[in-house]
A protein has these predicted regions:
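Beta-propeller domains
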Residues: 1-411
Length: 411
């Protein structure tokens, strides 16, 4: 009964039942409402022009408002924002009804990442947007706790790259300029305008949160790719980052994303030494994993624990695994939660208990799918007894397609 609020997850659900790529499906929100020990479920499409006019990736090309809105949903300043990284955000209400386009009173005229960060100390929402076709290839934005866009900065990059995620700390933002490079010549042959080109190098850009392009310090790292980050924080003259890092990347259809062990992410730690101008890089575990999360009240601060979804690699194609992982980040020690045989996991979202006494006093929520029975369910796991059976399972009255990211919104 302490768990009261809305769990909502976004994902790709093409109206026709078919899409050329799983990234192109229409955004559908799946909401589970919890109150007084009872649960109810609702699902809704995000009614953007992409949905209303039955558009596809080509017919919506160049229209920032025509968003699939299919990747994430984030709560900030009383608004729920449905996000997809090549488009503007769309606002929905807690009943999952579409409210309309959110361009911050006309101040946002570029795409917005699906992975903004809300600072737990200031309430600010920080985000970026990247462009595949025209300079500036990267823009940075800062939104006040009241929802006003108060800063925008153009950031210089030598070439257009896919920048899916990033990092923040108490005083800095960290951009990841990694070598998935936009090249429209690839689209005809691979179905994706991106290619992995390690010869372009990889680097991390550190900028004060209220800084601009001239303040960015770039630090070279080994070529790699990171779809998602756990967290980052400052410690003396260093910035410590925990990421799901893969040595290489493949970005065609979902089957083509998996090209062997080097294309699967694992937990790594990067330590940026601001005084020496260096970066140390260290793999902490062999477990294949992605979709990392922490307790959101520690975003940009030192978090002891991180949670992620296992990726199954002992099959021909990359598959959502049967386990969730809880990491003690500093040591890399891992605790596994087995969801069940032939159960496909989902992103683990942390929901804190009211007035917690420690960081992991709460629950992990994950929307999972039993492959044989086609039963979807929301599992609720005690984060402090992570390897034990779930404290509750909520059966969803219909199959929920595999999806992406979600949020817990406490009442």
């Amino acid at each position: 009964k302490d768990l009261s609020g809305l769990y909502v997850r976004n994902g790709f659900n093409p109206v026709s039942g078919y899409s050329d790529h799983w990234f192109f499906g229409n955004g559908m929100l799946h909401g589970v409402y919890l109150e007084n020990g009872k649960a109810s479920y609702k699902n809704k499409y995000v009614r953007t022009p992409y949905y209303e006019n039955d558009l596809n990736v080509m017919s919506s090309f160049g229209d920032l408002a025509a968003s699939p809105a299919n990747t994430h949903i984030v709560n900030h300043a009383g608004k729920l924002l449905a996000l997809e990284e090549t488009s503007l955000p769309w606002c929905v209400d807690k009943k999952l009804e579409t409210v309309g386009l959110e361009d911050f009173q006309g101040k946002l005229n570029t795409a917005m990442t699906a992975h903004p960060r809300v600072c737990p100390e200031t309430g600010e929402m920080l985000f970026f947007g990247y462009s595949m076709f025209s300079e500036p290839y990267l823009n940075y934005y800062r939104v006040s706790s009241q929802g006003a866009l108060v800063q925008s900065e153009a950031i210089e990059l030598p070439r257009p790259v896919m920048m899916h995620d990033w990092n923040i700390t108490r005083n800095y933002v960290i951009f990841m300029d990694l070598p998935i490079v936009a090249d429209m010549n690839l689209a005809a042959s691979t179905g994706s305008p991106f290619g992995f080109k390690p010869e372009c190098g990889a680097r991390l850009g550190v900028m004060p949160r209220n800084g601009n392009n001239s303040d960015v310090r770039w630090f070279d790292i080994e070529p790699c790719f990171v779809f998602h980050s756990f967290n980052s924080y400052e410690e003396d003259d260093k910035i410590i980052l925990y990421v799901s890092r893969q040595q290489e990347a493949m970005v065609g259809g979902f089957k083509d994303i998996y090209g062997g062990e080097t294309t699967v992410a694992r937990l790594w730690r990067w330590v940026i030494d601001l005084e020496k101008g260096t970066v140390s890089e260290e793999q902490l575990d062999d477990g294949a994993c992605d979709f990392p999360r922490i307790n959101d009240q520690l975003i940009g601060l030192k978090a002891e624990y991180g949670y992620c979804m296992q990726l199954k690699t002992d099959v021909e194609d990359l598959t959502f695994g049967e386990h969730l992982f809880k990491y003690h980040l500093e040591s890399g020690k891992r605790t596994d939660h087995h969801l069940g045989t032939n159960v496909a996991g989902g992103e683990p979202v942390f929901a804190s208990k009211p007035e917690p006494s420690c960081e992991d006093e709460g629950w992990i929520l994950s929307l999972v799918h039993e492959r044989e029975t086609r039963q979807s369910k929301l599992v609720i796991i005690d984060a402090q007894a992570f390897d034990q059976e779930p404290v509750a399972e909520i059966l969803i009255p219909q199959r929920v397609p595999y999806g992406a990211h979600g949020s817990w919104i406490q009442d």
